[in-house]
Structures are given as C-alpha cells and as structure tokens.
Amino acid sequence: MGNQVKTAALLAALSGLLIAISYWVIGGSSGLIIGIGLAAVTNLFSWYQSDKIALAVYQAQPVSEGEAPGLYRMVQRLSDRANIPMPRVYIVPSQGANAFATGRDPEHAAVAVTEGILNILPDDELEGVIAHELTHIINRDTLTQAVAATVAGAISFLAQMVSYSLWFGGGSRDDNRGANPLGVLLTVMLAPLAATIIQLAISRTREFSADAGSARLTGNPRALARALQRLEALAKQIPLNANPAFEPLLIINSISGQFLGNLFSSHPATEARVAALLKLEQQLPTKAY
C-alpha cells in the first residue's frame, strides 16, 4: 500500500509539473486551462496506446509458439500459474540483454525480451525475468510506467519547443504578454530534469515489488538474483539503445550506484535487489514447481 500511495503521488506530481509548465510559459488562466487539457489528453493517450508506443520504441516483433517455442511456453506456463491471461510475446532485435512488459491491463499486455537475453540466460534465470515482468502486469505497473514516460516526454517536448522559440525569436513580445519571463527560463532549464527525476522515482518504487512477485511465482529467488547480476554486467557492455523516457520499462539499467546514479537511475541498485531476494529466499517454502 505504501508503494501504491507513493506512486500515485509521484504521478500526480508529474501531471502537476506539466500543468505548471503551461501556466508559466503561456501565462494566466489560459495557460492553466491549456495545461490541464494537455495533461488530460496525454494521460488518456497513454492509457490506450501505451503498449503500442513501447513496442514501437524498441522495434519489438511479435512471435508465435512455432517461432519461439521455448519462450512462448514459458510465458504461457507462468501466466497460467499467475492466473492471468497470457500476454502477447515479442522479441526485440538487439544483442543487449534486457526485457520489459507493457499494456494498460492484463487483458491488453505484452512481454518482450531481447535476442541477447535469450542467448545468455539459462532457463531458470529467464523464468525469473519473465515472472518479474508478469508481476508488473499483475500490479498494473506497466500502465503506470507508460503514463509516466509519455507525460515526461510531453514535458521535455514542450520545454524544447519553448527553447527553440527563445533561440530563433518565434513570436513577438506582444504575442507573449501573459508569459512570465523568469518562468519561461526556469521551464526550459529545469522542467525536463524534474520530470526525469520524478519519472525514475516512480519506476524505483515498483521494482522491489516485481522482484518479490517473481520470487513467489517461481519459488526460486536466487535464480532471479543471478539473472540481475548477469544482466547488469552485460547491460554496461551492450546497452539497449532507445528513447531514455522508456528505460524505466526495462528490467535492468546500467547507471552506476553513486548518489547521482541513484537519483537518475530508473531502478534500485542491483546489489540492494539481490540482497532483498536472498533475504526473501529464507522466508519462502521449498520450491514446489
């Protein structure tokens, strides 16, 4: 419950930031109304298009049971065990080792893994990764993360447009009488940074829960712990290149564990995640599967 409240508060802060940007840049009640409308449209768009956006960003390709029988049957088996509809299965054409889930609810969900992760993880570790992604679907984290990514992207886009306007003289002084000059400057400089920090904080609140859900679903926390360690090392060697706004969807990232790394990381430190999994191992009954 604590993580859910924190996530809701962070999402509200992100939408509030989008509204504030419009207010400061456009000025007055018009800016406020436009900001509220933009936030509403962005969130509604994310609700219906979140899966399509994420899959397109990573160029994920759908696969059938005949094309990837081992992966397909693993997703099917774990979905049955979790008592959720089987999500669509995708493969990302990249040697970077990673995975993600997307979709607004379990009935409209998808799980995607890279070619790289299929090549390097043994079955028990891959099972832990798939179970982690299915837990995101069960918890509706996939929608939360997609909305956060889309709103953060809208904030960055708006700030970039304002920046271009300032540099290239778009609009006269009379056209912008309602705008607050200091607000415009602060928007261009700080809004994308603030949006990124909030978005990444949202992601970090969900990862421990997904790890724990994976451990309970497979009965094998240690396998996921090994997978996370292996994936972190490989992610630094072969990163999965895409829009940074969608990095929180991935199971692992490659940002260092220093203070600034933690602040701008979409995930908790891998060491902390591994420690939590090994602690959970002591609390779980003997693996039944």
UniProtKB/Swiss-Prot annotation:
One of the record's GO molecular function terms: metalloendopeptidase activity
Output the Gene Ontology cellular-component terms: plasma membrane
Q: Which catalytic residues are annotated?
A: 133
Co-factor binding details: Binds 1 zinc ion per subunit.
Residue intervals passing through the bilayer: 7-26, 31-48, 151-171, 182-202
Q: Where in the cell is it found?
A: Cell inner membrane
Sorted keywords for this record are: Cell inner membrane, Cell membrane, Hydrolase, Membrane, Metal-binding, Metalloprotease, Protease, Transmembrane, Transmembrane helix, Zinc
- GO biological process, alphabetically ordered: proteolysis
**Official protein name in the record:** Protease HtpX homolog
